[in-house]
Amino acid sequence: MTGIAAASFFSNTCRFGGCGLHFPTLADLIEHIEDNHIDTDPRVLEKQELQQPTYVALSYINRFMTDAARREQESLKKKIQPKLSLTLSSSVSRGNVSTPPRHSSGSLTPPVTPPITPSSSFRSSTPTGSEYDEEEVDYEESDSDESWTTESAISSEAILSSMCMNGGEEKPFACPVPGCKKRYKNVNGIKYHAKNGHRTQIRVRKPFKCRCGKSYKTAQGLRHHTINFHPPVSAEMIRKMQQ
């Protein structure tokens, strides 16, 4: 073997720990050294660096600069990139979703609207003692035995028909009773006047009369009075009273 051939042979021979293995190319030798003789444990590397802090062996540098290391790094990038894109797209889509406006109370739940009844169509948002429902008035007991009561006969239709349609009118709601010149700024004012302003001027008959002398305007009012004050007497109760 010539000197050049011997030098070439020994140049690709592993000398780590008396290994002595020969490789055809330098790349194969480096790969062998990296896989079998270089410890990649961080604790071992840190210990070696503390023992020899002035320099780093070229084999450790080549460990991170070889084609195999670069291919591994590219593979990791390809695996991470789709996950990153999916995360970004999902965060953007969540950011575009509009949330429903909150109410002043802070709840997403819409406020409950009370049911509208015929008697509440002209009811004030802040009802006063003058704004009883018509059905509630029917249930009230009569204060006397007479079959007449006083009540305003001004209906909601009459109030609306008397409303001034001129937008510049300060008090558009006028009382429809002939001779009355009262005017009001809102429907609550004219409603209160309609129920109280002419109460003593109009008499309404209460045709439904109880045997006790109480009179009511409707059969419903009389029935409510009878159920509460004159309940039917059962046969068993009559027998107990006769004993």
Swiss-Prot record:
GO terms for cellular component: cytosol; fibrillar center; nucleoplasm; transcription repressor complex. Residues 118-130 have a biased composition (Low complexity). GO terms for biological process: lipid metabolic process; negative regulation of transcription by RNA polymerase II. Residues 89-108 have a biased composition (Polar residues). It comes from the Eukaryota. Residues 89-151 are annotated as: Disordered. A zinc finger (C2H2-type) spans 12-37, 173-198, 208-230. Residues 39-79 are annotated as: Required for interaction with NR2C2. Expressed in range of tissues with highest expression levels in testis, liver, muscle and fat and lowest levels in kidney. Detected in liver and white adipose tissue (at protein level). The modification Phosphothreonine is found at T109, T113. SUPFAM superfamilies: beta-beta-alpha zinc fingers. It is found in: Nucleus. Residues 131-148 have a biased composition (Acidic residues). This is Juxtaposed with another zinc finger protein 1. It comes from Mus musculus (Mouse). The gene is Jazf1.
